[in-house]
Design a protein with these regions (language model features):
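A residue-level signal for beta-strand positions that form part of recognition/binding surfaces
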Residues: 4, 68, 129
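N-terminal membrane-targeting/pre-transmembrane regions
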Residues: 1-41, 121, 137, 147-149
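Short, solvent-exposed secondary-structure boundary motifs
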Residues: 15, 50-62, 112-114, 119-123
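Generic detection of short hydrophobic beta-strand segments and adjacent strand-loop junctions
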Residues: 3-9, 87-89, 142
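Hydrophobic alpha-helical transmembrane segments
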Residues: 41-53
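C-terminal/domain-terminus segments
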Residues: 142-159
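Non-transmembrane, membrane-adjacent beta-strand/coil modules in membrane-associated proteins
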Residues: 78-141
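Conserved beta-hairpin
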Residues: 53-96
Length: 159
């Protein structure tokens, strides 16, 4: 068996467009309120600190790895943050692979190994996902920003 990695993708928490826009809008609101407060009021300084804190946290979250997806050795390996366990999905037990939309909603929270209603979800950002169905009927939904390459790698490993 080869240990060669066919596909690797890293997904970071702070790089999703909509939450980043919300955080930056909050920071801009704090700066605007600080600008229009009187010099006598000390609450304006607190708003300046909050605005800069939001920006620093956003920058830090841009480098915070949520999870890494690898396809190698006829399996999909997903490992996440420090306290999460490695999830290994054996491709020999997969009966159906399809590319589909992750969710019908506009806003989706990042999840790792979320068990809900017969599905196991892994998602950080993007709109599309790979749906893997195993022999027992359990569906793995893995969100990806490179869905076509991920699908091609899985189908190549299953052959």
């Amino acid at each position: 068996m080869s240990e060669k990695t066919v596909f690797t993708e890293k997904q970071y928490l702070g790089r999703e467009f909509i939450p980043l826009t919300i955080r930056l809008a909050l920071a801009m609101f704090c700066f605007a309120v600080d600008f229009f407060t009187d010099e006598r009021e000390r609450s304006g300084d607190l708003l300046m600190v909050v605005g800069f804190s939001i920006i620093v946290i956003s920058i830090f979250m841009g480098f915070l790895l949520h999870f890494r997806t690898r396809v190698q050795n006829k399996s999909v390996l997903i490992d996440g943050l420090w306290t999460t366990r490695l999830v290994k999905i054996d491709l020999n037990s997969i009966v159906k692979v399809e590319k589909n939309v992750y969710s019908k909603y506009l806003f989706n929270n990042p999840v790792y190994n979320l068990h809900s209603k017969g599905t196991i979800r892994f998602f950080t950002a993007g709109k599309e996902a790979i749906h893997l169905t195993d022999r027992d009927g359990l569906v793995y939904i893995i969100g990806s920003q490179q869905v076509n390459e991920f699908l091609r790698a899985i189908e190549g490993e299953m052959k």
